[in-house]
Design a protein with these regions (language model features):
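Short, basic/glycine-rich phosphate-binding loops at helix/coil junctions
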Residues: 6, 66-67, 83-88
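Residues at the C-termini of beta-strands that transition into short coil/loop
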Residues: 41, 77-79, 124, 140-141
């Protein structure tokens, strides 16, 4: 059984029927049901603060039903990564490295050996390639 960190875009694809990647939802959910899930709080902030929360109230129940399973889903506090992520984002703002704050926090988590090994499930593979030896899984390829 793997541990898989799920990026915001994957939650949107699974539970927002209007998302361009929703066609992958069934495959994604089958995979997630087989593994332990790591959910960094920033991905919840990003997911819930999008069109998802504003327009798709009923589908949020699917997300919360999935996430509220403490035997499979592990919420990770981002406090330890916030300041460094902010600092990196602002120092790289004019260097052509445009990562979002959420993506930077995920990248820092990927570097944190204390979290143990995990894979990252994301449609935005390019945002995470090259961080340690973390496996990056593109949902279109599962």
């Amino acid at each position: 059984m793997k541990r898989i960190l799920v990026d915001s875009c994957v939650w949107l694809a699974c539970f927002d029927k209007t998302d361009s990647n929703h066609c992958c939802a069934d495959k994604i959910l089958k995979v997630l049901n087989l593994h332990d899930i790591i959910v960094p709080y920033p991905t919840l902030y990003e997911t819930i603060n999008t069109r998802f929360a504003k327009y798709i109230y009923g589908q949020m129940n699917g997300l919360f039903g999935f996430i509220n399973n403490p035997s499979k889903v592990h919420l990770v506090d981002d406090t330890a990564y916030r300041e460094r992520a902010r600092s990196i984002i602002f120092s790289n703002i004019n260097k052509g490295k445009p990562y979002s704050l959420v993506d930077m926090i995920i990248r820092l988590m990927m570097e944190d050996v204390s979290l143990g090994p995990f894979a990252v499930l994301t449609f935005n593979v390019g945002d995470f390639v090259g961080v340690n030896s973390t496996e990056i899984i593109n949902p279109r390829e599962i």
